[in-house]
Amino acid sequence: MNQENNKNKISIIGHTKGIGKAIADISKLEVVGLSRSNGYDLSSDIETIMNKLDDCQYIVVNAYAGNNQLELLKRIYNKYQYENKKVAVITSTSGTPQGEDEEFGNATYKEYCQHKKDLIKYIEDIQQELIKKPLSIFDICPDVVDTEMTEGMWDHWPKLKAEEVAECVWLCFEKPYNINKIVIQKNAN
């Protein structure tokens, strides 16, 4: 792969709504969008998605599909650890002890929290290895974001805008150093 060809491309897994769309909207790069809406389902097409990442220096793992977000990240790490790529992974404060809403007893939410915990732990575990490698992986960990996914939920909490999360992704991508983790929370006005 020619490293010069990939400098102007960003792949966003989950690019049509919410945070992924906000990242695509502010991108000055060619966007390689990979979502269910255009035939790339993270639940069943990990190999196909991986093949689309070769030509992209920037990758955003945004789409949530159970444990497949983690499986995709593991494959990205194994394949690209010796390449100069930057990967932003959208995790969630729901995957942290402080962020999980204990009062929200929905089984789907509990499963979501566990998958995000596993994802955050994996990113933490590989950070020491990444110091000696050209690959950068950023844990972008927002609190509640005002998107279709959170409609009608946590309305009593201040919500981040998807654009605010997108700005943090670009902050990480533009820096010459690795920002291991960025936690974003909206304060009440």
Residue ranges with predicted function:
Residues 8-28:
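N-terminal Rossmann NAD(P)H-binding glycine-rich loop of SDR-like oxidoreductase domains
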Residues 12-13, 60-62, 86-92, 136-141:
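Structural signature of the Rossmann-like NAD(P)-dependent dehydrogenase/reductase core
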Residues 30-51, 64-67, 71:
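Adenosine-cofactor binding site in Rossmann-like domains, unifying the SAM/SAH pocket
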Residues 35, 49-61, 85, 178:
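A glycine-rich helix->loop->beta "capping" turn
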Residues 68, 81-131, 143-144:
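Catalytic loop of short-chain dehydrogenase/reductase
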Residues 73-77, 122-124, 166:
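Short-chain dehydrogenase/reductase
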Residues 139-140, 154-189:
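C-terminal helical subdomain
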Residues 142-152:
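Short, flexible catalytic-loop segment of classical short-chain dehydrogenase/reductase
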